[in-house]
């Protein structure tokens, strides 16, 4: 099958937002107007097309990023729906990694909310161009210009309206296009009948003012436009559109649009903006990777003529076809039935069938071209972030960073039959979601699952029950603490055993130093002159890694420590890998006496919205929970308090806030960083873990 849409006419976009900003409804409307759905599904009726897992339909939130393909104005638009809830950040990160552009949906009553900040920050890290859609203009309290202001204040974004609303709340009836300087008036409920008229008299002055601001902002990003602007020459609409496109693709400018997806207003204009301002695969830099055979850096430009290279960004288990691997093709062409190399794992994979996904239905295709997104059936060893490439032109593309889990639960199967099924279920769920970890406590035999938050683990336990029919008892959530060293030290680990026959002998000197936050464990071999033979060096590193998994203070995994093996000795006959592993673990224990070991706890960025009258209570809550306030701002009759609070102190806070504010207060929290726990708390944790 020949290529249907050229690369220039392809858009890979994500729709990202805070939970409840109306993202799924917006995606639904896109699918409706692009002819993919015949009836519109509402999230609050639990009938949405993109939310196809049962839990999503019940909770009215989007958990898995379903990839959908649609057509608009002669272009192919691949849409990845991303979740807005903070517990599912990996889903957002995975989708951002394979997108070329994104639409950020705001609730125009609230503007930028905490999760919007998190997703925006991630999109900035990945260099993703964005347009902003201020949604819910029909809602009470909707304020378009306030939303634009929050983009400046909270995100320091160079964002400017390219539209203005006509009316707001119940009176929201149309949109002013600041480029054409025309009014688009909606005359029916489905938003399919649009009248283009002159701008109403009472809005003309405001429209002229904001068009002038728009031209000035765009001119500042382009020298030629700036010269014209300063010399008072007229900038044509075509020049303005080209200027906006260039600045948006360079992530220097963010066009802001408005509408109400629920009331079917503004979605088609937003689709026009996706085509006009967001990049095609040709507009973004060629993806870079490393050749696994030569270690040389290589590029893969977007072209069907280049060798095949793709990134697997999502694994899903489908009840009908089994394991689906979603992938983005960066270069080359892939045919079903062919073989590819998984360069991340060094394994050859056969592509069984290739499917193009539409929310919950699928179309089988023979060939997928560069710049496209599809799902493959039949890949056995591929996991999230793996590179799939031509066998003759191997390359490893930059993978997807996985955040560490911050919360854990104990799960216990209800019966022996459940025990076997639970192992399989947890393994499958962990394959789909890299932020979900499963560990078995060697001493107690308990199974512990860890994830990004309570909702995250709730959903996974729920899926285990529904999809895999496993009945399990679930313990109370526990915080995932970590341990580290705060001072440098040198320590000896000496192990010698003589008990008839072959003895054991291992002797090492290791220097331990604190590592930068987030850098993890780093091992350096600085042995000179073979005082520890080469074949035993890996055993020393392994011995340290195994010991660090259980910490030195309270049994928590150690992070951010450098270990330099610089001296030692061995015995010709008695030295073995086991002896050096034990010696390394003894060195770690010895180091703990002088390296100032510390317990680290996850700190959450908590945003609390409460009525002005309850501000004192809220500040009291933060202080009582060992938190520190980072900032406050007024919004209508409410106050928004931002604070850093330990996760350990946040369990049950929803109930406390509800009763203090008569149900009017809300809060959101997102993991921010790890921090040392105070000495008194550290002593309590150690006591508790030693069962005192």
From Swiss-Prot:
Function, as annotated: Catalyzes the GTP-dependent ribosomal translocation step during translation elongation. During this step, the ribosome changes from the pre-translocational (PRE) to the post-translocational (POST) state as the newly formed A-site-bound peptidyl-tRNA and P-site-bound deacylated tRNA move to the P and E sites, respectively. Catalyzes the coordinated movement of the two tRNA molecules, the mRNA and conformational changes in the ribosome.
A single Gene Ontology CC term: cytoplasm
Transmembrane segments: none
Domain of life: Bacteria
Major localization class: cytoplasm
Lineage of source species: Bacteria, Bacillati, Bacillota, Bacilli, Lactobacillales
SMART domains: EFG_C, EFG_IV
Subcellular location per the Swiss-Prot or TrEMBL entry: Cytoplasm
Any one Gene Ontology molecular-function term assigned to this protein's record: GTPase activity
Protein name (database record): Elongation factor G
Keyword line: Cytoplasm, Elongation factor, GTP-binding, Nucleotide-binding, Protein biosynthesis
SUPFAM superfamilies referenced in this protein's UniProt entry, alphabetically: EF-G C-terminal domain-like, P-loop containing nucleoside triphosphate hydrolases, Ribosomal protein S5 domain 2-like, Translation proteins
Presence of keyword Ribosomal protein: no
Sequence ranges assigned to domain tr-type G in this UniProt record: 8-282
Family, per entry: Belongs to the TRAFAC class translation factor GTPase superfamily. Classic translation factor GTPase family. EF-G/EF-2 subfamily.
Any one GO biological process: ribosome disassembly
Gene: fusA
Residues involved in GTP binding: 17-24, 81-85, 135-138
